[in-house]
Curated annotation (Swiss-Prot):
Primary role: Part of the high-affinity ATP-driven potassium transport (or Kdp) system, which catalyzes the hydrolysis of ATP coupled with the electrogenic transport of potassium into the cytoplasm. This subunit binds the periplasmic potassium ions and delivers the ions to the membrane domain of KdpB through an intramembrane tunnel.
Record's protein name: Potassium-transporting ATPase potassium-binding subunit
Underlying gene: kdpA
Family per similarity comment: Belongs to the KdpA family.
The species this protein was found in: Salmonella heidelberg (strain SL476)
A Pfam family the protein falls into: KdpA
Keyword Cell membrane attached: yes
Length: 559
């Protein structure tokens, strides 16, 4: 089993790196605002048609453009969901959503969280899925990538005040990166058996003679961008454990690769844009190390079996509860770590049924900010925040002004870095405390004791860090939970983006200082270790008390 796990991890990372490197080169061209080959003429027509100028924006203008797009999308999506019954492509005649569920769902998909307090096949029409959720899957992913583009330009430019044109970046990211790659993935899914139609649900008779209604819909197209954009919201309630979303072992591998593809490619793009590929590789090494360790821990925990079943005399050599037999325990464990290391949240197994330690690792990966590869764009700018914190700590130890890529890191940058890093832990801890203090919060818990608390902590961690996965033993479709999690999702997304853009605006105007003998090398093994230590230290100090009350207590209470 250990050899199989090693081969699975190694082959996954090898294929990922082979695919990510060429995509990173394309992303680097977009960061430099250089049109991809053969599309310059098309872009000129688009700019004239859409009224987009070549005028570059400062950080406030860039941020305002992104906020305007996202708030407009939030309002439109809310209306689509609330008045769903009056809109077309609703063969099952499904009613509109309640105001609190519509708000929660709209915020969820606009913020790239895709938390779902509903069952897709029994709640949403095809029009809501296509014109509402799928569109936001593209736009929320493009927003995250645009933010990291602006931050990377802040490091690579000097003595200017502009970070690019947000509208041009959003169009280029969507048309030349997200759409073509998602199209290829969708065609592969269709070939593997994922439905793509607008048919009404199909009544069938099973082999046992029972009547059943099979859900249909444009699944493959949404599934592709769901994974590529690290969105994670499933067309069906069972998400990627549903055979219509994830029918084969090949689609399972393709989905995991799609989740990490752009986050890994952005590391290569960062190195190329910075003029030193070692900088991108250093971040990639740090992410990969944490990722491999986490996968190994989850695989080990799940292979141990379920102690409750063993105590009852059942044969439980491995913990297969909540897992699909077509994937097995190792692929399910790998998927769980991939989806929570990134801000995806798609699941091919029920995380609520993992062992205590096996479920704690995905929860912790979310709590540290999902900087291990992370979401498209958000993972890299989140890791760069920890880079700034790491060079600041190193500067304190050696008595030098911290700098990164030749840019001095001053008080303003560190204040914004601290604010961005502290936003999500505050939301998680305060939100969990509020839920446990109120009857409305506790009434949603279907399990008592440490596991019940873990379900609450996981839900708020998932929302605040824009992941979207859940311990399914929480009945979260209530006004209290819909509003609480919507607030956490919105602040967790834009409460980090705003200080990141402020950092970019401050750094872009600074001059690049030449390296000297006292300059900390940020591409070597020493700095990689310092960066990993910084991520682990912040995660440990912030969340160990809460984790001790949940999964740790549950683990030590096992028979």
């Amino acid at each position: 089993m250990a050899a199989q796990g090693f081969l699975l991890i190694a082959s996954f990372l090898l294929i990922l790196l082979v695919l990510a490197k060429p995509l990173g080169s394309g992303l680097a061209r977009l960061i430099a605002a250089v049109p991809l080959p053969g599309v310059a003429g098309i872009e000129r027509i688009l700019w004239r048609t859409l009224g987009i100028t070549d005028h570059e924006m400062n950080w406030r203008q860039y941020l305002l453009a992104l906020l305007t797009l996202n708030l407009l999308g939030l309002g439109i999506l809310f209306c689509l969901l609330f008045w769903q019954e009056w809109l077309p492509l609703n063969p099952q005649r499904l009613p509109g959503l309640s105001w609190d569920l519509a708000l929660n769902t709209a915020v969820s998909f606009v913020t790239n969280t895709n938390w779902q307090a509903y069952s897709g096949e029994s709640t949403l029409s095809y029009f809501s899925q296509m014109a509402g959720l799928t569109v936001q899957n593209f736009l929320s992913a493009a927003t995250g990538i645009a933010v990291v583009f602006a931050l990377i330009r802040a490091f690579t430019r000097q003595n200017v005040h502009t970070l690019g044109n947000a509208w041009q970046d959003l169009v280029r990211i969507t048309l030349w990166i997200l759409f073509p790659v998602a199209l290829i993935i969708a065609l592969f899914f269709i070939q593997q058996g994922v439905p793509q139609n607008l048919s009404a649900y199909q009544p069938i008779t099973t082999l046992e003679g029972a009547k059943q209604l099979l859900p249909m819909g444009p699944v493959a197209s949404q599934e592709a961008i769901k994974m590529l954009g690290t969105n994670g919201g499933g067309f069906f309630n069972a998400n990627s454990s549903h055979p219509f979303e994830n029918p084969t072992a090949l689609t399972n591998l393709a989905q995991m690769l799609a989740i990490f593809l752009i986050p890994a490619a952005l590391c290569f793009a960062f190195g190329e844009a910075a003029g030193d590929r070692r900088q991108g590789r250093a971040l990639l090494w740090a992410m990969s190390f944490i990722f491999v360790v986490c996968v190994a821990v989850v695989m080990w925990a799940e292979v141990q079996g379920n102690p409750h079943l063993l105590a009852a005399g059942a044969d439980s050599s491995v913990n297969m509860e909540g897992k699909e037999t077509r994937f097995g325990v190792l692929a399910s464990s790998l998927f769980a770590v991939v989806t929570t290391a990134a801000s995806c949240g798609a699941v091919n197994a029920m995380h609520d049924s993992f062992t205590a330690l096996g479920g704690m690792v995905p929860m912790w990966l979310m709590q540290i900010g999902e900087v291990v590869f992370g979401g498209v764009g958000s993972g890299l700018y989140g890791m760069l925040l920890f880079v700034l914190l790491a060079v600041f700590i190193a500067g304190l130890m050696i008595g030098r002004t911290p700098e990164y890529l030749g840019k001095k890191i001053d008080v303003r940058e560190m204040k914004m870095t601290a604010l961005a890093i502290l936003v999500t832990p505050m939301l998680v801890l305060l939100g969990s405390a509020l839920a446990m203090m109120t009857d409305a919060g506790r009434s949603a818990m279907l399990n008592p004791g440490p596991h019940g608390f873990s379900e609450v902590l996981y839900a708020v961690s998932s929302a605040a860090n824009n992941n979207g996965s859940a311990f399914a033993g929480l009945s979260a479709n209530s006004p209290f939970w819909n509003c609480l999690l919507a607030f956490c999702m919105f602040v967790g997304r834009f409460g980090v983006i705003i200080p990141v853009m402020a950092i970019a605006g401050s750094l872009v105007s600074k001059k690049v200082q030449p390296a000297s003998q006292g300059t900390l090398a940020t591409h070597g093994a020493l700095f990689i270790g310092l960066l990993i230590g910084t991520v682990l230290l912040v995660g440990a100090l912030t969340f160990i008390p809460a984790l001790a009350l949940g999964p740790v207590a549950e683990h030590f209470s096992l028979p």
